[in-house]
Amino acid sequence: MSTQEQVIRLMPDLFTPFTLKSVSVRNRIAMSPMTMYRSIDGKMSDFHLMLMGSRAAGGIGLVFPEQIAILPDGRTSTRCAGLWDDAQIESMSRVVQLIKDMGAVPAIQLGHTGRRGSEKKPWHGKTQLPPDDPDGWQVRGPSPFPHGRRYTLPVQQLSIPEIKEIHRAYASAARRAFQCG
């Protein structure tokens, strides 16, 4: 069977519903999480509402907004969304509800960027900002070494209590995500 025949044979499955335990998705098309750099204080904006809602209305079955930071220093930049504070629940709930209203299933990717954080937005060079910059902070990670050539800031190595703090922050962010719907 040629590759084209295989694609044609498999394509219909892409548009069929899929159920995993109690979650049913109308098709197998997913919107992966993409950092949009449009949040303020970790809160999702009307931009997120428009983007995610239009994708859900357009037929995507599973919609991930963007990586959702669990702590302020776990963001890529100051303009990234988060759920480290109850004040962020309302804005994300609006986005989640619209995704559902449009027939899609909302999903979430919680994250902490660690030593790769404190960055400028991509259209400003995507280089790291030092802690003394108004939009920068001290990056933390599992080792004191920067993550690759593009990342140049000194890294504060996480202590065991700090690792436990991040673990608790994941749990707290997950509870907030559940409250969002």
Where are these regions (language model features)?
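N-terminal capping/small domains of soluble enzymes
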Residues: 2-113, 120-122, 166
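Non-globular sequence segments
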Residues: 97, 105, 111-178
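Active-site-proximal glycine-rich helix-loop-beta segment
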Residues: 181
